[in-house]
Amino acid sequence: MSIASVASVFKGEHAVGSTVTVRGWVRTRRDSKAGISFLAVYDGSCFNPIQGVVPNSLENYDNEVLKLTAGCSVIVTGEIVESPGAGQAYELQVTHVEVTGWVEDPDTYPMAAKRHSIEHLRELAHLRPRTNIIGAVARVRNCLSQAIHRFYHENGFVWVSTPLITASDCEGAGEMFRVSTLDMENLPRTSDGKVDYDKDFFGKEAFLTVSGQLNGETYACALSKIYTFGPTFRAENSNTSRHLAEFWMVEPEVAFATLSDIASLAEGMLKYAFNAVLAERMDDLQFFAQHVDKTVIERLQSFVSSDFAQVDYTDAVDILQKCGREFEFPVSWGIDLSSEHERYLAEEHFKAPVVVKNYPKDIKAFYMRLNEDGKTVAAMDVLAPGIGEIIGGSQREERLDVLDMRLEEMDLNKEDYWWYRDLRRYGTVPHSGFGLGFERLVSYVTGVSNIRDVIPFPRAPRTANF
């Protein structure tokens, strides 16, 4: 006898006729007049539960098996047999059922209903992993995460753990969560009445990071190829389906790399990750295609087989102005492209993933390399059909005098970035990188449109439960 996951049984990793023990939770119980019960037991290792055929000859059949309801936890031992019914290749002829946990009141068990709205499930974030949709999201999220780590490992990158607490604003937007141990009801003040952060834990103002990029650059300028993969925070008061206050970012940084180099890196990473999901999580993708978005499988297959188009921002604006489409937000040179513009380019004009590059400097961050025209920077966005922007990146400004000029233009104190400026003073090199919002990637792959449903415990304005 061996402990087996449901997935390993369905994959044929255990011989027909062998005895295995499966541990999980009851999804359903059906009883037949012939004195047999059918238990659907789910352990989360794959989308489908396994069927256990339980005879009434078991010692605890009447007093326990017939009382099992959805959500009860069980340890089931039985012989693997080929299933005569459609839908699964194998089932268990059960010889032993151990009940490890009962549902206190089946009538009030929140997950007992056949179907809940996705909005209602957000109020039950501690129980929603038990549902088909959130379980499938979790497995796909894990698959994508593992694939991304694997991709960078196989390509010689070093994973760097960048700090979550920082004194630097990477984006220069100021939308940061402050970290403080000061007594909010008795704040120390300076002589001019301002909060005296010298008395705070770090002796200065500190914040939750909006990006690991600046710290990542320091390691790229020593180890050549690095990436970060961790949580980031934005105090942006946007209560939309596309925004979270806490989300995960993948941020590679490569020394001696140009904008073209990281555009190729982004394409390789996305295709690698999507191929992994297509190969490893087809059961979950089939669920999403049936119940969430019928195009998900076809969209991923099309993505991995397409060459990325490339277009300059200036040319993209020209395409949008001449396309004859009336957009909600009018198009002119100098604007940041909105989602409707991005999706038109990817879905209707190029009909493929597209890299838009060389954006106006005034709508991009201080660290992006100024182009020779003095008006644009070496920035790029990767636009995907079906969602729009999925990656943003740039060649970094490696010239100290130009970096200082950009900091001044954006009214940022260069003394706050002294260590970042040091990279340009001691052996500076051209280098480039990008950021991938991981939840947006999971949303794209699953078709689950609200980003709050693709992270286990969403953090958003007025939402910090659990």
From Swiss-Prot:
GO terms for biological process: asparaginyl-tRNA aminoacylation. The keyword tRNA processing does not apply. Its main location: cytoplasm. Keywords: Aminoacyl-tRNA synthetase, ATP-binding, Cytoplasm, Ligase, Nucleotide-binding, Protein biosynthesis. Disulfide bonds: none annotated. One of its GO terms (molecular function) is asparagine-tRNA ligase activity. InterPro entries: Aa-tRNA-synt_II, aa-tRNA-synth_II, aa-tRNA-synth_II/BPL/LPL, Asn-tRNA-ligase, Asp/Asn-tRNA-synth_IIb, NA-bd_OB-fold, NA-bd_OB_tRNA. It holds the Pfam family tRNA_anti-codon. Its EC number is 6.1.1.22. One of its GO terms (cellular component) is cytoplasm. It is found in: Cytoplasm. The keyword S-adenosyl-L-methionine does not apply. NCBIfam families: asnS (TIGR00457), PRK03932.1 (NF003037). Belongs to the class-II aminoacyl-tRNA synthetase family. Homodimer. This is Asparagine--tRNA ligase. It comes from Shewanella sp. (strain ANA-3). The lineage of its organism: Bacteria, Pseudomonadati, Pseudomonadota, Gammaproteobacteria, Alteromonadales.
